[in-house]
From Swiss-Prot:
Organism taxonomic ancestry: Bacteria, Pseudomonadati, Pseudomonadota, Alphaproteobacteria, Rickettsiales
HAMAP family per UniProt: Nudix_RppH
Protein name (record): RNA pyrophosphohydrolase
Nudix hydrolase domain boundaries: 7-149
Described function: Accelerates the degradation of transcripts by removing pyrophosphate from the 5'-end of triphosphorylated RNA, leading to a more labile monophosphorylated state that can stimulate subsequent ribonuclease cleavage.
Top-level taxon of origin: Bacteria
Length: 161
């Protein structure tokens, strides 16, 4: 596939894991079926790390996390054709993402998905890495497989520490 890089919305994704090695996922308000890891756009002039920490606070409602790693390259995905007109006014055909692995060092009470006036998620839970892809929306499954492949060994090492 030839990628039109200007047609992809730049954003960050966050794989937030707890001390048991489980990953935070949320169920979006616009879906009853799919769960996803936090992600969001990068503001003008914002560094990737800043965007990731801001998105963590906005979507998960916590700052009780430490960045462990960042994936090597942009990961691209395309939206289904029927979804493009309804997302970002049809400006993008998909997203390009840089992913951050973050270790959560807080407790359950330190997560507040209603932190903003317009929350992203209606529910959340900790999920085993092995079951992340199964609950993801179909057009993001390959992204999740790539992120898991890149970060899974670092999660195991970080649990031990």
């Amino acid at each position: 596939m030839v990628e039109q890089k200007d047609k992809y919305r730049p954003c960050v994704g966050i794989m937030l894991f707890n001390k048991q090695g489980h990953v935070f996922i949320g169920k979006r308000f616009d879906s009853d079926s799919y769960w996803q890891m936090p992600q969001g756009g990068i503001d003008d002039g914002e560094k990737l790390e800043q965007a990731a920490l801001r998105e963590l606070l906005e979507e998960v409602g916590t700052d009780k996390a430490k960045i462990i790693a960042k994936n090597k390259d942009w990961i691209y995905y395309n939206l289904p054709e029927e979804v493009i007109p309804t997302c970002w006014n049809g400006r993008y055909s998909g997203q390009k993402q840089r992913w951050f692995l973050m270790k959560f060092y807080g407790e359950g009470k330190d997560i507040n998905i209603n932190y903003t006036d317009h929350p992203e998620f209606k529910e959340w839970r900790w999920q085993s890495v092995d079951n992340l892809v199964a609950g993801a929306i179909p057009f993001k499954k390959e992204v999740y497989k790539t992120v898991i492949e890149e970060f899974s060994s670092q999660i195991k090492v970080s649990i031990i520490k």
